[in-house]
Amino acid sequence: MAAAEPAVLALPNSGAGGAGAPSGTVPVLFCFSVFARPSSVPHGAGYELLIQKFLSLYGDQIDMHRKFVVQLFAEEWGQYVDLPKGFAVSERCKVRLVPLQIQLTTLGNLTPSSTVFFCCDMQERFRPAIKYFGDIISVGQRLLQGARILGIPVIVTEQYPKGLGSTVQEIDLTGVKLVLPKTKFSMVLPEVEAALAEIPGVRSVVLFGVETHVCIQQTALELVGRGVEVHIVADATSSRSMMDRMFALERLARTGIIVTTSEAVLLQLVADKDHPKFKEIQNLIKASAPESGLLSKV
């Protein structure tokens, strides 16, 4: 990992601190990607010690080939700002480690061990309103079958299920890691963050469901803002309005989010015909995905 300024990257001897800070130390909340972990550092700790602490807390999830910058949450502005030059920790604070730039040489790579599938709000009450809903259900089910074959964790949300119903019956939720109700549009809930924290080395999220311009868009932007690479499956996401869907996908692609297809995702995950699961994935995609009107309006 290259930092924004020189830093000692050796791991500290001690582990993460508990809820209370020891004498002579200051409590600090360390945020990385979708995670946030409380710890403590010595009073007066600077940039290098903060980097060491990030590595001790998140070492197995940080891509050492990428460049990162440390930012401090500024109450005055209500947002994160780059760590001021010569900064020293003197009081309780919140810091985060964010990618400084995207490595184009690795952009878009998917591996089963570093990928999670997000299935967003594929619920019964949306059936009459969402364009080509039957098609995206079919493709979504194919993706979940692929996830089971490859051992990829799946997280499913349902938007206000009391009023909008549960996930449609055609979507088989056997073996999914989590099914969560929500009212927030984004899928990035505290329970989702906790679930991701239990999965080592998460780099990428494959995202699909409804609606493209609301829950899908807000989930994708929040994940990217936390350093997660997002792949949106175009043939498994839709909206009530094709215009909303089209402009959402265009906007998301401009932010570096990858707009892809279900077959591209599944074949990228096996990567080689000699992969032990290739035959099962091949059988899954033998029947082409539905040629719906979605594909002419990406």
From Swiss-Prot:
Residue numbers carrying Phosphotyrosine: Y160
One cellular component (GO) term of this entry: cytoplasm
Keywords noted in UniProt: Phosphoprotein
Residue(s) carrying N6-succinyllysine: K279
InterPro entries with a match to the protein in the record: Isochorismatase-like_dom, Isochorismatase-like_sf, Isochorismatase_domain
Similarity comment: family membership: Belongs to the isochorismatase family.
Protein name, per record: Isochorismatase domain-containing protein 1
Gene: ISOC1
